[in-house]
Amino acid sequence: MKYLILILFFVSCSKAQEKPSYISFKLENDSIYVFAKNPVLGKTFLKIVDRKTKTEKFIDFNKPETLKVLQFEKTKIDTLEIVEKYQFSLHYGTSVFKEYDTLYNYGLPFLKGKRYKVLQGQNSNFTHKGDFSRYAIDFKMNVGQEVCAIREGLVIKVKEDSNIGGRDKKYRDKANLIIIAHPDGTFAQYVHLKKDGVLVNKGQTVKKGQVIGYSGNTGMSTEPHLHFAVYKPTKNGFVSIPYILDSIPTKRYKKGKFARNK
């Protein structure tokens, strides 16, 4: 199922009186300095948009760090006006994305010898539509089945505290998940995991085929399954991409077909 939290993994400032938690101010002499903090282990970038002129500025973070991103004369503007004037949003990845490895052969997200049915393939009529979820695949998996990393990488986000789910959009942010950054700058997400069903930690390096968690039915989900996709970062957030899965292009994983990890 579609899981939108990755488009912006921090909500941008939408109300004039609100300030994102990763933005801070420092008053020094005659200036106001705006700082942004990258709170995750992987690469991120800050997008700053002038609400009036629509001009954009991008700041890249290569590690957990705090950087000065703007400076103003305090006689001309105050902190409230800064938040009113600019929209801040923080995204995974880099603002200038290099070409990814289109020929990489990803592994199936389950153990060797296992066989699962495709519940929903790419670009389908239910939830795998639009740039974010077009190339996602759902495998029908009972609760508690082993989920494996489809590629080696760095774990940058985990969630496993939810025990609820359903069809309604109100459950969208209740999905347990794992996000892994790959060496070529792409990302994979594994969604709808069971409560306390994550076996890896943020900052941990995982190998291809390693068991990283257990399938479930949390979040916006109508039945137990594993939703996963591969993404590239863009200046407007994550975009799902086609890829090769167990030597087969993702477009050939159709609803009702089975995949076996030999």
Label for each model-derived stretch:
Residues 186-209:
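Short histidine-centered loop motifs in beta-beta connectors
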Residues 1-22, 36:
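Bacterial Sec-dependent N-terminal signal peptides
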Residues 137-138, 177-183:
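Short, acidic/hydrophobic/Gly-rich beta-strand patch recurrent on exposed beta strands
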Residues 64-174:
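Surface-exposed, glycine-biased beta-strand/turn segments
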Residues 164-168, 215-227:
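Active-site loop architecture of trypsin-fold serine endopeptidases
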Residues 106, 168, 199, 204-207, ...:
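Acidic, glycine-rich catalytic/binding loops that coordinate metals and/or anionic ligands
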